[in-house]
């Protein structure tokens, strides 16, 4: 049976604006972690036209809040959890791990580990398009306007980051900025 008070993982797949990778990246990763004995949760966050007003980042916050509030029911620790994320999901997870806009701002425990698979560091050339489509007329800070590496501090959670040298998607998104 399941043990109580285990470390858990929250898995966040990427997306291609209107298509989610929650099955390919999220569920498949979750299954492998589950097979290794880890309690695991997969986040389905808002994408496409539903991603305005920092919705994807807020979805990460709400997921960690929910898991934290129900830790006893799930048999998990509230501290030292891991976030495993991919692509654009890696960008919002990465921002959640920061002091500036992440967990601290919501009174949540700091992630114990960040596993960022080919995360988007910046939406550079897409920023104006995202702003027009998602938040027209809004000049406030939005996740898609943030360059993740600008928010990394010495207190950032321990991180394992990987990407493929021949990743054509990141190459089309201004490779040198990723």
What name fits each language-model region?
Residues 5-15:
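Short beta-strand element of the alpha/beta-hydrolase
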Residues 8, 34-44, 82, 113:
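A fold-wide structural signal in alpha/beta-hydrolase
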Residues 13-18, 165:
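Active-site glycine-rich loops that stabilize anionic/oxyanionic intermediates
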Residues 21-26, 41-78:
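Catalytic nucleophile-loop/oxyanion-hole region of alpha/beta-hydrolase
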Residues 62-132, 140-143:
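Primarily recognizes the serine-hydrolase "nucleophile elbow" in alpha/beta-hydrolase
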Residues 136-151, 156-157:
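Active-site nucleophile elbow and catalytic-triad environment of alpha/beta-hydrolase enzymes
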Residues 160-164:
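Short beta-strand/loop motif that positions the catalytic acidic residue
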Residues 168-175:
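Conserved alpha/beta-hydrolase "acid-adjacent" motif
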């Amino acid at each position: 049976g399941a043990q109580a008070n285990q470390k858990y993982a929250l898995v966040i797949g990427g997306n291609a604006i209107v298509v989610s990778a929650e099955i390919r990246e999220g569920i498949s990763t979750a299954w492998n972690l589950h097979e290794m004995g880890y309690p695991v949760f997969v986040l389905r966050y808002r994408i496409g036209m539903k991603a305005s007003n920092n919705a994807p980042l807020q979805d990460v916050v709400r997921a960690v809040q929910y898991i934290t509030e129900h830790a006893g029911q799930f048999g998990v620790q509230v501290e030292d959890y891991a976030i495993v994320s991919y692509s654009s999901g890696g960008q919002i997870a990465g921002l959640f791990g920061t002091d500036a806009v992440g967990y601290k701002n919501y009174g949540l425990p700091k992630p114990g580990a960040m596993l960022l698979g080919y995360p988007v560091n910046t939406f550079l050339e897409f920023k104006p398009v995202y702003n027009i489509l998602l938040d027209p007329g809004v000049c406030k800070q939005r996740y898609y306007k943030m360059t993740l590496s600008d928010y990394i501090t010495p207190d950032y959670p321990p991180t394992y980051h990987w990407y493929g040298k021949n990743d054509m998607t990141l190459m089309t998104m201004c490779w040198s900025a990723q």
